[in-house]
Amino acid sequence: MEKTVIDLTAGDKLNERIYTKLGVAIQDMLLGLSLAGFDVPVSIKGTNKQLAAFYGAINGEKRYMDAYNQYGLNDPHTFKNKHTLDRAIRQFENETGIRWPFKN
């Protein structure tokens, strides 16, 4: 598997091809987090704040997916995780200038 580089400092330089590649890389990371022992070769570049915001958003996505799988969509646990995820996504977008690819 080819190592993917995600550059969070290139917010205003993103075009559709790069943005699609970012979405695929993040999707692969989320699937890797869901499957035990699956390592995704990704390198992430950015400032400390950008990296922290990215980690928060990825972690929020994982927690939301886990809550959805365990409790279903209409459970308070899932709602709480969705709210936390939305805050993490806003933080990511504010820090990087990049729209989060999985906003729903």
Which residues does each PLM region occupy?
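Short, charge/polar-rich alpha-helical segments
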Residues: S34, F38-A57
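Charged, low-complexity interaction regions
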Residues: V40-V42, A67-F79, I98-W100
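Terminal amphipathic/targeting segments at protein termini used for secretion
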Residues: M1-I6, Y68-Y71, T78, Q91
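Cleaved targeting-peptide boundary
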Residues: R17-Q27
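Amphipathic coiled-coil alpha-helices
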Residues: A53, A57-E61, A67, N74, ...
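Proteolytic processing junctions in secreted/extracellular precursors
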Residues: K3, L8-E16
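Long, non-catalytic architectural segments outside compact domain cores
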Residues: I26-L35
